[in-house]
Design a protein with these regions (language model features):
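Metal-dependent amide/peptide-bond hydrolase catalytic core
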Residues: 211-318
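Histidine/acidic-residue-rich, glycine-tolerant segments that coordinate divalent metal ions
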Residues: 82-84, 89-101, 107-108, 123-233, ...
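Acidic/His- and Gly-rich active-site-bordering loop/insert found
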Residues: 1-102, 111-115, 119-127
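Conserved active-site and cofactor/substrate-binding residues in soluble primary-metabolism enzymes
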Residues: 4, 24, 28, 32, ...
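Predominant activation on well-ordered alpha-helical scaffold segments within soluble catalytic domains
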Residues: 10, 34, 114-118, 144-147, ...
Length: 318
């Protein structure tokens, strides 16, 4: 990449870092990216509302007849931020939006994809290429809105990456097979009956059942043998309110469940639900379940991995 283009995408990344936006609120971020692309290259930009893509179309038959036999491919990046306070205030491009920052590096992801757009515009490709700029990755909603494009354009392969600290600059780190665990948020609500704090026996307090479930899950992961990585992380527990005259009548516990294999994620959830029902029955409580942020496992295609490895070796990247 020419230094001029590199300087442009570094400046773009700093601009995005200054103005982070939360998932489903990224209109200004999207506009900044579209403006950058339209000001610097001639490729077509297609705005799909919450997200957009850039389209490189080969010159069919006349100059590149071989392109007709090569299926389209896509590259994808995200551009939403997180509800986390910026802790690098000394940087000249620190977040200007209180309580919001690019802690997952999506400013870098989107800028890198914009850099690829610059290269495509200058150097071309031997097939049609689609650059997908996706919103709302952090809450698991954005990708679903982009999926129809795959069928619409008959895209055969999609490539993406995540920045990863701790490796040499410019290193290309590849993982065969599963690269990201399947995961989902599970909230279990225990409903009993409130009573005066002086007569707790006349109510049904969920605290004992929730305490039992916490201990069960802690022991479960130590005692149970799964084929691959499995995690159940407690992210929130709420029981009653801070009212010293009332014995709690409702409580809930939330887990993030993760597993390298989808079937083991399902198995883990069922084990937790079975015990929750047992503990609830012992205390005379009712149960309900809610789910958030479901993600299937992400498994890398072996042939795609090999193509990336070969490209990195040709460029002498570590």
């Amino acid at each position: 990449m020419k230094k001029e283009n590199r300087d442009k995408i570094v400046a773009l990344r700093h601009d995005l870092h200054c103005h982070p936006e939360l998932s489903m609120q990224e209109q200004e971020t999207k506009n900044r990216l579209i403006t950058f692309i339209k000001e610097n290259i001639q490729l077509e930009v297609i705005d799909r509302g919450n997200w957009f893509y850039v389209q490189y179309t080969t010159k069919r038959q006349s100059e590149m007849p071989e392109a007709d036999t090569k299926p389209p491919i896509a590259f994808r990046a995200d551009f939403d931020a997180l509800p986390i306070l910026e802790d690098a205030e000394s940087l000249p491009y620190a977040s200007e939006n209180p309580g919001v920052s690019h802690k997952c590096g999506h400013d870098g992801h989107a800028s890198a994809l914009a850099g690829l757009a610059l290269e495509l515009d200058a150097n071309g490709a031997d097939r049609d290429v689609y650059l997908i700029f996706q919103h709302a990755e952090e809450i698991g909603r954005g990708a679903q809105e982009c999926v129809p494009l795959i069928k619409e354009k008959k895209i055969a392969e999609i490539y993406g990456f995540h920045n990863w600290s701790g490796f040499p600059k410019g290193a290309v780190v590849l993982r065969e097979g599963v690269s990201q665990c399947a995961s989902r948020g599970l909230t279990i609500t225990f409903t009993g009956k409130k009573s005066h704090a002086s007569i707790p026996e006349q109510g049904k307090n969920p605290s004992v059942a929730i305490a039992k479930l916490i201990l069960y899950v802690q022991n479960l992961l130590q005692a149970t043998t799964f084929e691959q990585l499995v995690l159940a992380t407690i992210v929130n527990v709420e029981i009653g309110t801070k009212d010293f005259g009332i014995s709690a009548g409702e409580g809930e516990i939330s887990f993030t469940l993760r597993a390298a294999l989808q079937r083991e994620l399902d198995e883990l959830e069922q084990m937790i639900r079975t015990q929750a029902e047992k503990f609830a029955a012992e205390e005379g409580l009712q149960l309900s379940y809610a789910y958030d942020d479901p993600f299937p496992e992400t498994a890398n295609d072996a042939k795609a991995i090999e193509r990336v490895r070969n490209a990195a070796e040709k460029l002498h990247l570590p």
